[in-house]
A protein has these predicted regions:
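Hydrophobic transmembrane alpha-helices and their helix-loop junctions in integral membrane proteins
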Residues: 1-2, 13-215
């Protein structure tokens, strides 16, 4: 229940950061983000209620994805972790937030889902092909994208895939590697988004086709 409360708390805080850009695109992206993430929270709450009805416990531990409760909770985590077919909110919302907001979003929102997956579904083998797919498909979108902050959003989705693979493997070494990767990713992706913010402030555009000679 505590996880659900703060899960929804991050949604509200994230939407505020997106709306802070005060553009029409940011408003539309923020509303899509809000609807999708509230849906994620409802799946989490439904799974928690069913889990309590079945076990009499609300302790956050390892869940069985073969049960209804486990499947609903996994779906909630998958939405926030941007699983394939559940990922569009990320590339829509992150580039439309303020520069500072994008840095904060990249550092904390998806990492909450990675942490939750590691706590609840470590060693769930079908996470390996899901994560492998996540490492591959964003690259094809990134290479044809003109908005550099969207490129970084696809790159973020790609890196989440490696973390999901590590969680799916579920060994002590793979989970330690996932934790280290997540920690490093918070730092270097934030720096990349800050550098794109500096380019935006300096040039007034973030379109790759309109930039050149940045030295």
């Amino acid at each position: 229940i505590t996880l659900f409360v703060f899960w929804e708390g991050t949604t509200i805080a994230s939407v505020i950061l997106i709306f802070a850009a005060r553009t029409e695109r940011a408003y539309r992206a923020g509303m899509r983000y809000l609807v999708i993430q509230i849906g994620s929270g409802l799946f989490l709450l439904a799974g928690a209620v069913i889990y309590y009805a079945e076990t009499g416990s609300i302790a956050f531990g390892a869940f069985d994805p073969a049960t209804i409760a486990g499947a609903l909770i996994l779906l909630a985590f998958g939405i926030k972790c941007a699983f394939p077919l559940l990922h569009n909110w990320l590339e829509d919302a992150y580039p439309e937030a303020t520069v500072t907001g994008t840095v904060i979003l990249s550092a904390f929102t998806t990492k909450l889902a990675v942490y939750a997956l590691a706590r609840g579904f470590a060693g769930t083998e079908f996470l390996v092909p899901i994560g492998a797919t996540m490492t591959a498909f964003p690259i094809f979108f990134a290479v044809i994208e003109n908005d550099l902050r969207r490129v970084l959003s696809y790159s973020l989705n790609n890196q989440l895939g490696f973390m999901v693979v590590g969680i799916g493997i579920g060994t002590e070494l793979s989970l330690s590697g996932t934790a280290a990767h997540a920690f490093c990713h918070v730092i270097y992706k934030a720096l990349l988004f800050m550098s794109m913010g500096a380019v935006l402030y300096r040039t007034g555009t973030i379109k790759a086709s309109e930039l050149g000679g940045l030295y």
